[in-house]
Amino acid sequence: MLKMMGQMVITLREGFEAALLVAVLVAYLKRSGRTEEVRFAYYGTIAAIAAGFAIATAVIVAYGGLHGEQKELFEGFASYLAVGVLTYMILWMAGKDVRGEVERRAEAKFKWGIALIAFVFVVREVIETVLFLTPFAIAEFTTTVIGASAGAAVAITLAVLILRFEYRMSLRRFFYATSVLLAFIAAGLLGYGTHEFVEVLEEEGFEHPLFEKAYSLGIDESNPLHHKGLIGGILAVMFGYSASMEWVRLILQLGYLAAMLGLIHRSYGRVTERAEV
């Protein structure tokens, strides 16, 4: 259960954002007396989820056709891409007015326009989720699927409850806390992707002082504290822990984490004193 926490946090955050956007859209339509258009919001949502499954399947099939060094390069690029999109998403969401954005877009009277709005809202989050989860799915497919499913279920439940109780939960606090968690996860992905690239370069005979080990805890893979073990695996997913690291990985990982935590804190300010989303 604990080893899937990273995947669960990702889908909880992304799924919650998507579910909240759709829930606000549906509530706005009902409040505006446009109940006959609610089904179009659901049509758009279903189409977006289907598109997400198609993209995920294509990624898995593409990875399955790779071998050796190609897989390492794919994992490295997938990790870097996930970090890039994740970074953009965290900072972009910091300044969003969820309710206001949805209601402005929903003012259009075209029914299929409502479906398109819902599709755009959801497919963006679905694609981001697929990108974020790809490195995890490559390493542990079953754990990733279970963790992602659990996160999505919790996200949908939270979105419905929050809408029903009229935003009594502080959404800014929620997004602030999950942004901090995601910053640690993204830093770990950056480190993992860097490690894969280092391995490829070393196999090609390329050497550099930064590729040398910055530290090694001397932990055997059979030890639960190893990053492939039970306890170490949890820490690896959630916080980017590894039993050993190259200098370049350590520098990039810690540098990214420090920069992101600073930007997140600056973007949200003193969360307890800020207005809710």
Curated annotation (Swiss-Prot):
Cell membrane found in the keyword field: yes
GO molecular function: ferrous iron transmembrane transporter activity
Domain of life: Archaea
Annotated Gene Ontology cellular component terms: high-affinity iron permease complex
InterPro entries referenced in this protein's UniProt entry, alphabetically: EfeU/FTR1-like, FTR1/Fip1/EfeU
Subcellular location: Cell membrane
Membrane topology, as annotated: Multi-pass membrane protein
Coiled-coil zones: none
UniProt entry keywords in alphabetical sequence: Cell membrane, Membrane, Transmembrane, Transmembrane helix
Transmembrane segments: 46-66, 73-93, 143-163, 174-194, 228-248
Main subcellular location of this protein, as a coarse class: membrane
Family: Belongs to the oxidase-dependent Fe transporter (OFeT) (TC 9.A.10.1) family.
NCBIfam families membership: EfeU/Ftr1 family ferrous iron transporter subunit (TIGR00145)
Protein name (Swiss-Prot/TrEMBL): Uncharacterized protein AF_0154
